[in-house]
């Protein structure tokens, strides 16, 4: 999905007053990050790390997991497409409705697609990969983390891709990598772009078994993550949680908007988690 994702003000050449086409937190203050990157701008005169190892080390330490279970990517989208490429031609099941990049990536790499409208994790006929967005985009639904762990353990023949790009936008408990180091059929996808409200820098990562991480590294291009993005990621991790979204305020504003829209005749606002 190259066009149609949203947040495309560049196409219109004018200031956008209110942009509802993207799910990024709108109240981020990136002033300190901007000043830091200005000081570090000289790094663009050199190639970045072929793999963002320095950032991976910081992430692994912060998460309390082995370094060989983390791979930093050029946004969560690169992670999705790399996974689809690694398992090219496999069968995939994608619950509906959900983020369309899973289907787009699977189609490019010739997956046999099937759909699960009920989001029932127990339904796995002949499918080998189960793609799950949790919290789900666009519905906001959050599946119980204990249920996910149970299903992953009970079905070792299948692979599970759980996209947790929006984990910082919910109060519901979600899976933590430290609790899943024994799950060798699981890939967790994360978005630092959304976590720290920096979508223009494209920064994400995959948590999985060392074997899967190594295989993913073998098919990706070098220098996939640029030097500025790597520096921004390290800065954000050091300053966390100062750089995190104001979740209570964000959710309160979402509720206010929901109530205002619901008051309009002919407008039905669907509930979210």
Describe every region a protein language model picked out.
Residues 75-85, 162-171, 178-179:
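Glycine/small-residue-rich loop that forms an oxyanion/phosphate-binding "nest" at active or ligand-binding sites
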Residues 66-70, 164, 184-185:
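Short acidic capping loops at alpha-helix termini that bridge into adjacent secondary structure
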Residues 114-170:
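Active-site phosphate-binding strand-loop segment of PLP-dependent enzymes
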Residues 1-46:
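N-terminal "arm"/small-domain region of PLP-dependent enzymes with the aminotransferase-like
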Residues 48, 60-82:
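Short loop-beta-helix segment that forms the pyridoxal 5′-phosphate
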Residues 84-107, 119:
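Conserved PLP-anchoring active-site segment centered on the Schiff-base-forming lysine
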Residues 185-262, 266-269:
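PLP-dependent aminotransferase class I/II
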